[in-house]
Amino acid sequence: MFFPSLILAAGSLSTLIQAIPHGAKHHHSLHRRAAATYAVMGGDGEASDGWPTISQWSEYETLWGLNQILIAASCDNSDDETSDINTSIKSIASETGVDARFILAIIMQESKGCVRVQSTNNGVENTGLMQSHDGEGSCNKDGSKTTPCPSSMITQMIQDGTAGTTQGDGLKQCYEAQTGGTAAKYYKAARTYNSGSIASSGNLGQGGATHCYASDIANRVRGWAGDVSECVEATIGTITSGVESALGGDDGSSSTSTSTTAAQSTETAEPVQTSSSAAEQPVTTEPIQTSSAPAQAAETSSAASSATSTETTSVAPAPTWTPSSNVQVAAQTTTPTPSWTTKSAPAATTAPAASSSASGTAPLYPYASSSCQKYYTVKAGDFCDKVTEAVGISFLDLRSLNPGLDEKCSDLWLGYQYCIKA
């Protein structure tokens, strides 16, 4: 029996957190947990440059809880599939010595935790949850999706990205190739995993591929998990230090996932203009490597614990990682990435008009009928019942014209044009 869905397309995870639909799955109750704000990190990843140390990373269970909300909002995973990600992360972390928090951060950066994420190819086939180097694990081979995604395949995806493949390094190899403090080696490993190398300057915001990659990962392990990074690709390479110098914390040789995080801080980091780009005890130690971010991917985070932060005198207090009840979400760009789109409660607004032909500005939903004659652009606050009522078609017709829509209509993409007549 079909039940009208209340999952919507909107622009901010904070709206989703405040308006979970009735009958939502139990993991949505995690919305009361705090999420850290984003702080742009530039330079070489070392604590001396203001990057967070291992002691400033959030605990794994906190990170998992916050990112679980984003996975639910961004993907078509079943509860079992999402649970299998959690189980596999901890298992592979134990086998490889790679910190479970780091593995989770890379998964969220690369695929937003969507088990049926498509592969990408920029000269190398990047597959699965971690977009590994020619990995064997995938539940979306050549556009053919596997549902349900077997737990063994989910484990294989995480194995490929963490331990490496026959064709390329994983996180473990990337980590072991680095020097410096434990946390810095992770940030450097993240950059290597993304681009294959680090710029000769040592600045993690320079070089190829995604310039903000290391900054994003440093924020993720610290408790941020937003939809869109507040780091600016065009300028991050000019920044030579982080914004967290005022925070204490040793960067010892061992990493522990039970460490506390900065709680109340003196001042939140100023938001930066955004740019877009594609479990029990966590196991820690030394891990890590490589690939470019996929076109289909999804993000949001956690924080909060015991330690209090210090306040500076005279000069303005340094920006710090302040826990916040609402995730910082950047404004949507002109070409939003589908899996990064979050859904929220419907707004009481009039329905936007449908267009008789594809718009030149809004992107087409990739699974729309190839013979489509009329389109509708999804607006903030839209949900399937609202769209079908506005354009005068049934939900079954909407699905037949846009085969990518699931039966619960849980994956409307904000800003995309859907077919409403063929």
UniProtKB/Swiss-Prot annotation:
Functional summary from the UniProt entry: Might have a role in sequestration of chitin oligosaccharides (breakdown products of fungal cell walls that are released during invasion and act as triggers of host immunity) to dampen host defense.
Coiled coil (UniProt feature): none
More info: In plants, chitin acts as a microbe-associated molecular pattern (MAMP) that is recognized by lysin motif (LysM)-containing plant cell surface-localized pattern recognition receptors (PRRs) that activate a plethora of downstream immune responses.
Name of the featured protein: Secreted LysM effector LysM1
Species in which this protein is naturally found: Penicillium expansum (Blue mold rot fungus)
SMART domains reported for this sequence: LysM
Region ranges (Disordered): 242-360
Record remark: domains: The LysM (lysin motif) domains are small globular domains involved in binding chitin in eukaryotes. LysM1 contains one LysM domain.
Family under the similarity heading: Belongs to the secreted LysM effector family.
Disruption phenotype: Does not affect radial growth rate and colony morphology, nor lesion development on apples.
Gene3D superfamilies per record: 1.10.530.10, LysM domain
Gene Ontology terms for molecular function: chitin binding
Bias-annotated ranges (Low complexity): 253-270, 289-319, 330-360
Signal sequence, renumbered to the chain: 1-19
Residues bearing attached sugar chains per UniProt: 86
UniProt keyword annotation of Signal present: yes
Highest taxon of the lineage: Eukaryota
InterPro entries reported in the protein's UniProt record: LysM1-like (IPR052210), LysM_dom (IPR018392), LysM_dom_sf (IPR036779), Lysozyme-like_dom_sf (IPR023346)
Biased composition (Polar residues): 271-288
SUPFAM superfamilies on file: LysM domain, Lysozyme-like
Keywords in alphabetical order: Chitin-binding, Glycoprotein, Signal, Virulence
UniProt cross-references to PROSITE patterns, sorted A to Z: LYSM
Annotated ranges, domain LysM: 374-420
